[in-house]
Amino acid sequence: LAELSKGLVRGGEFELVQADLVLSTGRVVGLKASIINLTLFEDIFQYTLTGQIVIQDAMSLASTGPIIGQEYLKLKIKTPTVGEPDRIIDYSENAFIVTSLDLREPTSGGSQVSILSFCSREFAMNQRSVVNRTLTGSYSDIVERMLRKDLDSHKTFYKEPSAESKKIIAPNIDPFSVISIAESRALSKKHSDPTYLFFENLRGFNFRTLGHLYSSTPMLNYSQYPAGQKTDGKGSIDIMKNIQNLEEYTISSAPDTIYNHSAGVYASNMIVHDIFSKSYENYTYNYIDNFFNERHVDSFGSKPIFPLANVLPINPEGDDIADYPAKQYLQPTTGKNFDNSVQDNFFQTPFTPHNPQKSMQIRNAHMQMMNTALQVNIDVLGTTVVAAGDIVECNIPFSGTYTTTQNEVFDRLYKGRFLIKAIRHDFNPAENQHTMSMNLCKDNFLEPLEAPEENYEPKSKRSKGTITETWDDIGL
């Protein structure tokens, strides 16, 4: 990062090294001089990258090419001062696939504007592939096999090893469906973390847990700098402050109590039926009780962390918000220590069964929490240094018409470490400007909330009774 600002005139500069469209006829058309805008989307809840490119089509390429949705887009974009291969957007070899021509609109002078949508090649491979075989090994190895063999991907793969030997019988399903099974059931080998995510960012494919993502060192520190603070002592632009300045921000989400109850974020019950021993067991998940045994965005920071809820009794019996397991699960399993439903070539049973009690409730709580956690959308100047799945620091300014006794500089909740859930990259070649719109989230507080002992849910002490009413028909 120290080298990031050296040689830049201002934040958001980029170098468009290559932009070639390979037509279905084999003709290669250079687009560097024709691009009006280029957009790339990366998201930790999307398996592949997608994007759109807007071009000034003076040659009526959409017609004469023609562009029919079977083209390849070769891209290579970099921040001028960044030389590390994993910090360069390089799709010159693993080209994008153009999926559709979304718009052709005539402009003055006989030209036209065309908008093309594209995606990673692996998405197209998935749509035309079927898996109909038995897969064995750890879930992380099965995912790698899907990626390398069935999706024929040669991109970098960041893999966190998972535990135990498993067996998946794939009945004519696509590779992403196999990956989805592995993603939902895998436990990390080192930490038994069930929060695996499979996604593609600008560096490659990832099969990693939320805990692994949270353990990363923050890439950048975003804050809002007044105009006078974005220059150095000599009056020149301070590039790092320019890059890390919050141009715009919107607080987009906060905890949703009703959703968290119904989705099982706060609490859930699970009945696991063992079809081998004809027995069943009950398991209860409690968000408050489990909080400090799980990993959160700020678990790897220097400050203490607290649940994303106020831990106070809501009735005289002392129940808190996590004492109501409204979400119910019913899951089967096969055997205590082995999966007796499948055997290897030597008629042994080396595969461990699916144990939903180890993963399902915890995983579901974390995945659903990502929808209702503390989220903020920020607009900043672009750089190829950060990608979806990274950790950044972000401090939203305190906003209020009065000054508190603490004289806060930053918002009490929206500060510290955040996970990048999604990024929209916009490249404007005419202005040589790269901007990013990022969705950041965090699932913990950095300070405890005051929890008075008798702050119960208010309700009337007396019932107002029931009024029974009838009505007369009109004689039909």
Which residues fall in each region the model found?
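Assembly/oligomerization scaffold segments
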Residues: L1-R128
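N-terminal export/assembly leaders
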Residues: N126, V143-A170
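Short beta-strand-centered interaction patches in the first periplasmic/extracellular domains
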Residues: V113, S120-E122, Y158-Y266, N282
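Sec-exported extracytoplasmic/periplasmic mature domains
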Residues: L147-D152, E183-S188, C394
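An acidic/polar, Gly/Ser/Thr-rich interaction patch typically located in mid-to-C-terminal regions
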Residues: L40-P66, Q229-L476
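Envelope-exposed proteins and targeting segments
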Residues: V17, L49-G51, E71, S92-N94, ...
